[in-house]
């Protein structure tokens, strides 16, 4: 398996050191007041894009914790939207204050669907007959600015931030918008995708597969033939491996090529800017996601990405709490939270905060209602594991010659994830114990035993999965001078 060395830039440490402690619940501003601030920008014409709250008062924006209220604060009256040109609508989408959500969910399509569902702006745009043509014209003219200083809200529509450009590309790639078979639109889109894709493929220091994938997706859904012309035969460096719940249920885990340092910097910075009262506990990374951190390994060394569905599109996340080590509970006992509507998991800390990996974003400690995820439809779980015994068979002789070394082993060729510990008891006398024991083999699966006295010995073995005893076995061995 690939492991990655992440160089965390100075900017990351500066961001972390400047953050404040989290309050148990974030202060909320009345939505009506926020809307008034967001839209009171003076007289506007049909060609003028929306100026959203973050562009005029970032503090007021970040004081809004719940995601639902951020959507409410970004709403625009239908009368204003209907009077706007399609070009003005696209410009407004380019600087929409929730574009960062494309980095917050396992599947960017979920971010697009959620934004379209909650945003009258996007609904109005999709109702326009010239939507695809105007969108492609403006997308083709827009360049990507990967500088840390680039703002998501600066009103520069010819140079887009990373989050805004990724939103535009995923918006088309998820088939919310299509060329509808129009040759002129398709050709302009193909030319733009080819140019942008070539630039990103050439700059491997700045761009990883993460920045290439949405362009390849557009190419595939529109059948543009760009990837073929550039001889691209692999959309993403991905491995699929099998890991196991504590009680040995198989889980498909994905191992992704890591993001570039610049991509990690920008995504971390975006979430710190959007949620300054949350605390960064680990930088943005493609190594692991919220499910893997909450259910499998709560460590920065984790390098498995776990989806709700396995590689055959079968539900798998529920294996962690279905006849396994976790059980559903009331909120007071909670150790892990699952937010079903947003496919997100979080660890609940003793101070009441949540600790969760914001998918491509950083590992964040935050108040429960201060995140890119809804506060509704949450399920609560606690760890409820007790050590298991039995189930193991020890292979080896039961009659041995005194002072000869004998080998005992476990046949676990289909369980390479287990580790073992051995114990030997001399049953004829309590002490001293007359034997020599050494443990060897891969993961401790072999035991070398030399019985130094006559009598009955009890050989015991314990199997552990990630440190938890899930099985045991024992074997009676009789030692004698000869047989």
Predicted region positions:
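Bacterial Sec-dependent N-terminal signal peptides
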Residues: 15-43
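...with weaker cross-activation on analogous glycine-rich loops/strands in unrelated enzymes
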Residues: 303-365
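Aromatic- and glycine-rich peptidoglycan recognition patches
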Residues: 349-389
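A short beta-strand segment in extracellular, disulfide-stabilized domains
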Residues: 401-412
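Solvent-exposed loop segments of extracellular immunoglobulin-like
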Residues: 413-421
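Surface-exposed, flexible coil segments in extracellular/virion-facing regions
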Residues: 424-449
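Exposed beta-strand face motif in extracellular beta-rich ectodomains
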Residues: 455-459
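Edge beta-strands of extracellular beta-sandwich domains
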Residues: 469-479
């Amino acid at each position: 398996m690939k492991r990655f060395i992440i160089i965390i830039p100075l900017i990351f440490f500066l961001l972390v050191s400047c953050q404040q402690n989290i309050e148990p619940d974030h202060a909320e501003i009345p939505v009506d007041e926020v809307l008034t601030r967001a839209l009171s920008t003076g007289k506007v014409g049909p060609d003028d894009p929306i100026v959203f709250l973050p562009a005029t008062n970032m503090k007021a924006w970040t004081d809004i914790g719940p995601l639902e209220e951020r959507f409410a604060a970004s709403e625009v009256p239908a009368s204003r939207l209907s009077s706007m040109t399609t070009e003005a609508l696209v410009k407004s989408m380019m600087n929409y204050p929730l574009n960062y959500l494309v980095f917050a969910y396992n599947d960017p399509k979920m971010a697009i669907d959620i934004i379209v569902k909650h945003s009258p702006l996007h609904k109005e745009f999709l109702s326009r007959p010239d939507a695809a043509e105007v969108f492609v014209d403006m997308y083709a003219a827009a360049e990507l600015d990967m500088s840390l200083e680039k703002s998501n809200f600066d009103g520069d529509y010819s140079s887009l931030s990373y989050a805004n450009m990724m939103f535009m590309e995923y918006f088309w790639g998820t088939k919310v918008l299509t060329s509808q078979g129009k040759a002129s639109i398709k050709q302009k889109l193909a030319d733009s995708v080819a140019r942008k894709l070539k630039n990103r493929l050439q700059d491997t220091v700045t761009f990883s597969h993460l920045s290439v994938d949405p362009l390849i997706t557009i190419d595939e859904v529109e059948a543009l033939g760009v990837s073929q012309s550039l001889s691209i035969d692999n959309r993403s460096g991905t491995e699929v491996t099998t890991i196991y719940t504590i009680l040995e249920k198989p889980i498909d885990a994905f191992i992704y090529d890591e993001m570039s340092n610049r991509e990690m910097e920008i995504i971390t910075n975006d979430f710190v800017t959007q949620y300054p009262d949350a605390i960064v506990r680990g930088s943005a990374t493609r190594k692991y996601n919220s499910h893997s951190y909450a259910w499998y390994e709560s460590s920065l060394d984790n390098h498995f990405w776990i989806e709700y569905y396995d590689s055959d599109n079968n539900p798998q996340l529920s294996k962690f709490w279905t006849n396994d080590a976790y059980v559903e509970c009331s909120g007071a006992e909670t150790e892990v939270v699952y937010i079903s509507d947003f496919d997100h998991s979080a660890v609940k800390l003793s101070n009441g905060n949540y600790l969760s990996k914001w998918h491509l974003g950083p590992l964040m400690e935050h108040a429960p209602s201060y995140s890119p995820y809804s506060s509704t439809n949450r399920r609560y779980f606690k760890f409820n594991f007790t050590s298991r015994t039995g189930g193991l068979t020890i292979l080896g002789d039961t009659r041995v010659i005194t002072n000869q070394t004998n080998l005992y082993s476990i046949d676990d060729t289909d369980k390479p994830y287990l580790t073992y510990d051995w114990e030997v008891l001399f049953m004829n006398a309590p002490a001293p114990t007359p034997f020599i024991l050494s443990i060897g083999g891969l993961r401790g699966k072999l035991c070398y035993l030399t019985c130094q006295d006559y009598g009955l010995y009890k050989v015991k073995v314990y199997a552990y999965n990630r440190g938890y005893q899930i099985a045991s076995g024992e074997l009676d061995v009789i030692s004698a001078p000869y047989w």
